Regions:
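Short, well-ordered coil/turn elements that cap or connect secondary structure elements
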Residues: 1, 61, 146, 179, ...
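N-terminal pre-domain/capping segments
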Residues: 1-105, 179, 263-275
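Hydrophobic faces of well-ordered beta-strands that scaffold small-molecule active sites
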Residues: 2-8, 40-42, 64-71, 111-113, ...
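Active-site-proximal loop/turn and secondary-structure-junction residues that shape catalytic pockets
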Residues: 10-12, 44-46, 72-73, 117-119, ...
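Active-site acidic/histidine proton-transfer and metal-coordination neighborhood
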Residues: 22-24, 61, 80-183
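Generic structural signal for well-ordered alpha-helices
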Residues: 25-30, 52-56, 97-101, 134-141, ...
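Structural motif
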Residues: 35, 106-107, 207, 239
Length: 275
């Protein structure tokens, strides 16, 4: 059964980004539980914050699961990327992600590689950069396997990376890895920019998709843009997808309203797909 999740950012430097709740982890968990979400997806400043803020205790208190943990603070706060041409910068990037893979894994959740993948160029050709990316994903995927969870790799739109922009691009990168424990994060906002047919792209990536960001075409809550969710939900059902639809969206018009609109859209979409 497909499950619902909502995002929480704890990174001040990411202010203005597409996260529903901000800063107050306990308040966000409480609101998520009251609205009926199954889980939360957390964007922490570092791995230590998950323990310092007692995320495990909050999940137990509010009867929530942890859908995933983002690693993007490594880029937003420290300008680290896994494909930096300078090895002295690549190693701290990998260590930063490793710490989150471990912290998330202990809580039964995967870590996400999105902005930390970086870009190729600036004196580094695509083959070299792709080697660095594949090497990092392989190592991190094997690390995640020790906790019984996958690593999630997110194709991004062309304005954010030049590695994988479509699910097909992402699948090609997965085929280069020395592990089968890396799955794709299908972000419906990025897909609305890059895919010719989002539903078809999802079906073609059957078996590779491990997580979905539930967002409309304008990065607002589903129902606030022009994405037709019906064929996408049928595609996910056809794939046998039973993971999370996680709202990585702007808090429009405010966090509480965005969360409420998201859970309403989630229920409507899953009900329609089941009929």
């Amino acid at each position: 059964m497909i499950k619902s999740a909502v995002t929480i950012s704890l990174v001040p430097e990411a202010r203005g980004g597409p996260f529903v709740f901000w800063d107050d982890l306990e308040g966000a968990c409480r609101q998520a539980a009251e609205l009926g979400f199954d889980a939360v997806e957390v964007f922490p400043p570092d791995a230590d914050a998950l323990e310092e803020l007692d995320l495990k205790g909050l999940l137990e208190r509010y009867k929530l699961k942890l859908a995933a943990v983002g690693t993007g603070a490594g880029w937003v706060k420290h300008k680290l990327r896994l494909t930096d041409p300078d090895r002295a910068r690549r190693e701290p990037a990998r260590q930063f992600v490793q710490s989150i893979v471990e912290a998330a894994g202990k809580l039964g959740a995967p870590a996400i590689i999105g902005s930390m993948q970086g870009r190729w160029g600036d004196g580094m050709d695509r083959d070299e950069a792709t080697f660095y990316l594949a090497d990092a994903l392989t190592g991190l995927g094997k690390q995640a396997a020790r906790f019984g969870v996958p690593l999630l790799y997110e194709p991004l739109n062309r304005y954010e990376t030049n590695f994988a922009n479509t699910l097909a691009d992402g699948s090609r990168i997965l085929r280069q890895l020395q592990t089968d424990n890396v799955k794709l994060l299908a972000d419906l906002f990025h897909m609305s920019i890059e895919e010719v047919d989002v539903a078809a792209a999802l079906r073609e990536a059957t078996g590779d998709v491990g997580h979905v960001h539930f967002a409309d075409s304008n990065r607002r809550p589903v129902g606030e843009g022009h994405t037709n969710m019906t064929p996408l939900m049928y595609a996910l059902r056809h794939m046998g997808y039973d993971g999370y639809l996680s709202a990585e969206v702007f808090p429009y018009p405010d966090p509480a309203s965005a969360a409420r609109r998201t859970i309403d859209s989630f229920r409507r979409c899953t009900l329609d797909a089941a009929s």
